[in-house]
Amino acid sequence: MAQITEVAPDLFRITTFLEPFNLQFSQFLVRDAEPLLYHTGPRALFPAVKEAVASLIDVRTLRWIGVSHFEADECGSLPEWQQLAPQSDAVCSMVGKLVSVDDCLALRPAKGMTDGEVLETGKYRFRFLATPHVPHCWESGLMFEETQRTLLCSDLLHQNGNVEPVTQSDVVGLSRDVLVEYQQGPLANYMHYCTLTDPTLQRLAALQPKTVAT
């Protein structure tokens, strides 16, 4: 069963811990006039995530499905969600729309966003931030909710283990430990460093988010 935590007003973290992988998979539901589900989870977790979302909203009213980059835990069950919610559209970077999401997965054309574009869901405004290769993937893009100053930051600050849903402690060290650990196995180079990395991280820090949702 997924754990549900309200981490900011109307923003719910839905988390399933898979012990064999020592890893949490999290999705974020924004409860608003046009509900937004940021990340779908992989297909294997669709029943659990659907049950959690259904406890918060009528799943048929889901309007937006956020895809930060093209991996199973970000968008694996997108078709299932779009079948369940007939008015829902995927929202992703323009690169993601053009090179993968529309052709490989979405049942309907995705809303491709360019850097700085704003998506309004009702009370909340999500500014799209193009972040190619940060944390990974060419099509990567994050969302910053300007009303409550919440950064939906995808795999940035990734941590292993069944960690607490909300913390005010520094998690940079924990995230660095994961990167070092991953370098020893098949998940090496999980987040690489390139000329885009530092300016992108500096840009995100300059937003001064109150909440970082990862």
Describe the predicted segments one by one.
Residues 13-19, 41-43, 67-69, 127-133, ...:
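Short, flexible loop segments at the rims of nucleotide/cofactor-binding pockets, characterized by
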Residues 33, 59-62, 87, 147, ...:
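A general structural motif
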Residues 38-40, 62-70, 90-94, 151-155, ...:
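Active-site neighborhood of phospho(di)ester-bond hydrolases with catalytic His/Asp-centered motifs
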Residues 2-54, 142-153:
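Conserved beta-strand hairpin/beta-sheet module of binuclear metal-dependent hydrolase folds
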Residues 6-9, 89-214:
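Metallo-beta-lactamase
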Residues 70-75, 97-100, 117, 135-136, ...:
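Active-site environment of divalent metal-dependent phosphoester hydrolases
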Residues 45-91:
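Active-site metal-binding motif and surrounding structural segment of the metallo-beta-lactamase
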